[in-house]
Amino acid sequence: MPARAQKTQAHLPKGFTEKRANVDGVNINYKIGGQGPVVVLLHGYTQTSHMWTPLMPRLAASHTVIAPDLRGAGGSARPPDGYDKKTLAKDIRGLVRQLGYEQVKVVGHDIGLMVAYAYAAQYPGEVSKVVLMDAFLPGVGDWKEVWLLRDLWHFHFYGETPLALVKGRERTYFEHFWNDFAADKTKSIPEADRRIYAAAYARANGMRAGFEYFKSFEQDARDFAAFSATKLGMPFLVLTGEKASGTFLIEQVKMVATSVSGTVVKGSGHWLMEEATDQVVPAIVAFLN
């Protein structure tokens, strides 16, 4: 078995399988396991579906769990376009329908929370619950206060020169996120996971695709502003890091949804699943159950 396959299989939770589906011409890699109502887990930037490993077995006890790699990440295809969050949500909804499901609960972290919101906003009749974890919603409220923060320069770091600068240095670039966005870098992304993520984004067009997530924010802002004209009625759980987005995302979600429960996770930075596993996993499981 190739080394890469060994690494992938070694980190696949018991009871889960990894597959690929062609969704409207785009190959989407996903992990699936469990039985019951469907929960879709959407990862963020610098990560893949692997980030959900601590949560997947817990949810699989009562749910069918689908954890895809977003277009452009992990084992999914990396086409030149289609990285606005409306399109990414359509990819995931297409996967769900192809697997024979319609009704879902959606969980998203970082870029994944934007995709989760776009999914719920476009298909509100198909989404019963939403969990959003630590980032922000472009186009909602004072979103530009985050988008234009000097410390978040990476939102504007794309194009040929940035690509040339990070080529072969993917992990060096990602260390900035993993270390600086954590409350304590020693409790951030584990070493084994850092190797997995760096290798995934080092694949052909991986970094280009990642940059496209941010390049699309202005389009996302237009789309989300239009979505927000109609508040969503399904329950939302918003989890944020005390040392990261704090109450900002919670207040944003209250502008777009009518039933919002927000928790600022004490002592955590951006990487909630890794920094505060013992707080976050039970909270998500309880909410979705």
Residue locations for each model-derived region?
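N-terminal export signals
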Residues: 1-3
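Flexible "cap/lid" subdomain of the alpha/beta-hydrolase fold that forms the substrate-access gate
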Residues: 6-19, 26-28, 38, 66, ...
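Conserved HGGG/HGGXW glycine-rich cap/lid loop of the alpha/beta-hydrolase fold
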Residues: 26, 32-75
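A short, glycine- and basic residue-enriched loop/turn
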Residues: 48-49, 114, 269
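Short, well-ordered alpha-helices that flank and scaffold nucleotide-derived cofactor binding pockets
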Residues: 54-57, 61, 121-122, 282, ...
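Catalytic histidine-centered segment of alpha/beta-hydrolase-like enzymes
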Residues: 268-277, 281
